[in-house]
Amino acid sequence: MVEEIGPENVVHVVTDNGSNYKKACKELLSEVYEHIAWTPCLAHTVNLMLKDIARRPEHGVIIKQCKRISNWLHNHGQLNTMMRNAIGGELVKWNATRFGTNYMFLESIYRKRDRFMQWMASTEFQHSKWANTEDGRFTHASFASMEWWDALKYIIDTVQPIYKFLRFADQDKKPNICEVVMAYQTIKQELRSFFGTNVSTLKEYIQVVDERLGDVFIGTYVGPGKHVCSSIFKLY
């Protein structure tokens, strides 16, 4: 592609974050076209941040439970119809690769919290053939527990700054690097505000953000060791 356009006409290459793209571009540009910078796709980078955070134990437990509940609700036509009538709509579908969508999925469950709780306690559900199944009892126990809902809300709240960054990165008008830096600073400020004195967890979240954004910034004048905005990589 660079040869077709002409190396003299190219100053920057943006690709997917796949390891094959990353390795090939870094080797090619460093060895052959030293004047050309490479950065990964910003939206894909932020999506991978959410993937990393989803591996955290407190996230993994809730995500696994919500997937189990969602699969049960969608694998039985009559049950799914009953659910949609009870909560007044449908849930956002789980997606194995779109991690931003997956937190929308969690949020769609939480938004219907009151209706789910009413449905689980209703005569319609309690007298249905689904109520005494293993998944039915699990779903009822989860939806009847305020601790479970609080845990779900915590998971959603912890990723809100990063999820907003994903929407910013995935907009039709592609942001420039200055806008990215400003959005990055906003993430850190919002995470600080949320975690407060829980400095150790704050550092872990910001480390995920920094490690993923490293490749985005490294090819610009705001990367580590560069003379502009060198302080942006401080942990907190």
What residues fall within each predicted segment?
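A eukaryotic "domain-edge + linker/cap" signature
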Residues: 1-236
